[in-house]
């Protein structure tokens, strides 16, 4: 049983992780509704007085701690409100370039990439999707061909792990393809990677990227805080202050930054990631093996193996023939199991563009549900899911 979720079984970690306790927050004491420890540096980090400088010191300490975990320089990290804003800041900075070049993005990107690209296109910036294979991944050869086809492209956005299917991109080979294209043309190609579903789950090498986005709440940290890594500083789209080097103006979220630093140290250290990744693989190897025994069940994609290196072991997409995904989600919820149909950012949309890009037919797309696990997931959670599915299929 997932103790953090009480008597229910939470298997929607890709949407948000079960919160963990971390340093600056404690259980509420003395009527303090926020549970902030006495002495917390509450001042505005931009203020010159003692309280402000204490907050500034705490903010920069949090930045340095994050940098140590990610193995990058602190000055290349910028605190934001989360993955969506981090992605938007990078994309919209392209509007401020002297020459407006084309942007490429994988056809399975998170809505915060795809929808912002649509906005940029409406503003006159050319964009083009990169096709994916049936497993939802972008091949290095495909990226190379896309860059050859679009010689005016100077930007490529390809996520680390897909948030709906768990497809695991070979980022190293993709970056190599972008750099080779750059060497041939003599023109730079900015490589951006949405690492929201990768951080803390699979090994990542951020230093090779030009930019990357992260979110705390996917790791069990606070909502409303994220990170943007920039190898080279970009011009911010909006103004209103010099905070975060002008990349992200506005009074900084010191409490959130400390939360993010704490959760990165707890969940994203390389050895911790390796150990937890192995545990996750064993759990989902069991789950996928049991799902295969259910007659009306099919994995998406259909050739996903029980322990498949093409996929993150934290997310699996599965469908049940003749049962719409939302119907199965509601049926499982009544059985005490929380899953989803896909991205929480598009939960009100019946369309499944990620599955469509993978070549999944319309009916099968609508039958898909996403199961995603976390660090406290155990066999009892998976068995509850399997029992709930069997019960639902008995009357659906």
Predicted regions and their residues:
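Pyridoxal 5′-phosphate
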Residues: 1-396
């Amino acid at each position: 049983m997932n103790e953090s979720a009480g008597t229910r079984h939470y298997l929607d970690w890709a949407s948000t992780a079960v919160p963990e306790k971390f340093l600056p927050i404690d259980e509420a004491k003395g009527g303090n509704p926020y549970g902030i420890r006495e002495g917390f540096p509450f001042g505005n980090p931009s203020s010159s007085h003692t309280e402000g400088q204490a907050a500034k010191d705490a903010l920069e300490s949090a930045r340095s701690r994050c940098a140590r975990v990610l193995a990058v320089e602190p000055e290349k990290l910028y605190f934001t409100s989360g993955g969506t804003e981090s992605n938007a800041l990078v994309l919209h900075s392209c509007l401020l370039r002297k020459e407006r070049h084309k942007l490429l993005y994988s056809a399975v990107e998170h809505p915060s990439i795809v929808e912002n690209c649509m906005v940029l296109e409406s503003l006159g910036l050319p964009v083009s999707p990169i096709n994916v294979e049936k497993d939802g991944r972008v091949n290095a050869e495909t990226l190379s061909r896309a860059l050859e086809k679009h010689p005016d492209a100077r930007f490529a956005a390809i996520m680390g792990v897909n948030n709906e299917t768990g497809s695991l991109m070979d980022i190293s080979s993709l970056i190599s393809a972008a750099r080779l294209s750059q060497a041939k043309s003599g023109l730079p190609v900015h490589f951006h990677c949405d690492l929201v579903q990768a951080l803390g789950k699979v090994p990542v090498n951020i230093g090779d990227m030009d930019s990357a986005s992260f979110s705390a709440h996917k790791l069990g940290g606070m909502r409303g805080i994220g990170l943007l890594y920039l190898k080279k500083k970009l011009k911010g789209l909006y103004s209103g202050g010099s905070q975060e080097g002008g990349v992200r103006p506005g009074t900084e979220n010191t409490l959130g930054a400390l939360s993010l630093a704490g959760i990165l140290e707890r969940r994203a250290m390389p050895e911790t990631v390796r150990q937890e990744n192995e545990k996750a693989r064993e759990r989902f190897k069991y789950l996928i093996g049991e799902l295969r025994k259910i007659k009306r069940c099919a994995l998406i994609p259909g050739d996903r193996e029980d322990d498949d290196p093409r996929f993150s072991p934290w997310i699996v997409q599965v469908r049940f023939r003749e049962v719409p995904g939302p119907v199965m989600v509601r049926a499982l919820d009544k059985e005490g199991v929380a899953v989803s149909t896909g991205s929480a950012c598009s939960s009100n949309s019946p369309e499944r563009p990620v599955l469509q890009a993978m070549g999944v037919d319309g009916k099968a797309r609508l039958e898909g549900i996403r199961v995603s696990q976390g660090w406290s997931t155990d066999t009892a959670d998976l068995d509850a899911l399997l029992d709930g599915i069997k019960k639902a299929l008995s009357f659906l």
